[in-house]
Amino acid sequence: MQCIETNNLQQLLEQVKPYTKKGKLATYIPELGNANPDDLGIAIFHKETEYIHAGNSQTLFTLQSISKVITLALALLDRGQEYVFSKVGMEPTGDPFNSIIKLETTSPSKPLNPMINAGALAITSMLAGKDNEEKMERILHFVREITDNPTINYSSKVANSELETAYLNRSLCYYMKQNGIIDCDIEELMDLYTRQCAVEVNCIDLARIGLIFAMDGYDPYKKKQIIPKHITKICKTFMVTCGMYNESGEFAIRVGIPAKSGVAGGIFGCVKGEMGIGIFGPALDANGNSIAGFKILELLSAQEGWSIF
C-alpha cells in the first residue's frame, strides 16, 4: 500500500475544514463545550515509516467512548470471553448510545454490546483491582504501553464535569444492578468510568493505538505482542458493527474500516496489517461523530482503497 504524504493530508484537511461549521460541540458534558469547534487534526502511524500528521494533531482531548475499546480488551484479559459475554451481548442496536430501552424490553435483560453506555459500564465493573486507584492505574498503564507515551494521564476537570451530570448513566447502572448484571457500588463505578473517559491523548497517540489494533495487538516498533490477537479481533469486530454509534452502517459503506469515535471529537481507525489513524475534530454530527473526521476518512478510504469489504 502506497504511503500517504504529509502535504496530501494537509490538502485533505483544508478540503473538509468547512464541514466543522456544520457540527456542534458536545455541550451536555460542560467541559467539552469549551473546545474550539474549528479544530481539526489527523495523524497516521504506519508500521514501517512511523507517523505523519497535520492540523491540530497535537491538541489534547479526552478519549470518551474510545476508551470502551481499551476497557473491553482489559476485561477480556481479566475475565475471559465466556464471563464477559454472559453479562454483555454481541449485537448492534439502532438505539442511541445512552438509551435504556433495550435493557427494559430484551430478555434476558443485559446490554446488547460493549460500545453502548450500558455495556461499557458493565465492562468497566469487571476490571480487576482492589480499588478504583489500582483499576485506573491499570487503564493508564495499558494506554501508555499501547501509545508508547508514559506521560498520558486523565483530566480530573473533565471527569468531574461528567460525574456531576451523569444522571442517565447512573440510571443505567441501577437498572443493571437490579437485574444482576453488575454488583458493585454505583458511585464507585461512576467515578472510575468518568475517569477512564477523561484519559487525554492527541491524534498521534490515537493513531498509535490504531496501529496496534491494525497489527492484531503486535507492536512493530517494540517488536512484542501487547494484546492477544484473539482479543483485538473481538474489539475490531465491535468497532465495525457498533463503533460509530448510529452511523456504524453508513460508516462501513462509506469508509469500511474498524473505527471508534468519542464525543470529544476523536476517531481512531485501523487498516489491517498497515497503519492506524487518529483524528480530532470536536464539531459533531447529529449522531455524536466528528463531522469533518468522518469526511476525511471517507476521502482517504476512497483514495487509498482501505475498505475491508
Curated annotation (Swiss-Prot):
Keyword Hydrolase listed: yes
EC number(s) stated in the UniProt entry for this protein: 3.5.1.2
Molecular function GO labels: glutaminase activity
InterPro entries: Beta-lactam/transpept-like (IPR012338), Glutaminase (IPR015868)
Enzyme class name: hydrolase
Binding-site residues for substrate, renumbered to this chain: S65, N117, E162, N169, Y193, Y245, V263
Pfam families: Glutaminase
Key words, A-Z: Hydrolase
Gene3D superfamilies named in the record: 1.10.1500.10, DD-peptidase/beta-lactamase superfamily
Subunit structure: Homotetramer.
Similarity-based family: Belongs to the glutaminase family.
Protein name: Glutaminase
Organism name: Bacillus cereus (strain 03BB102)
Gene: glsA
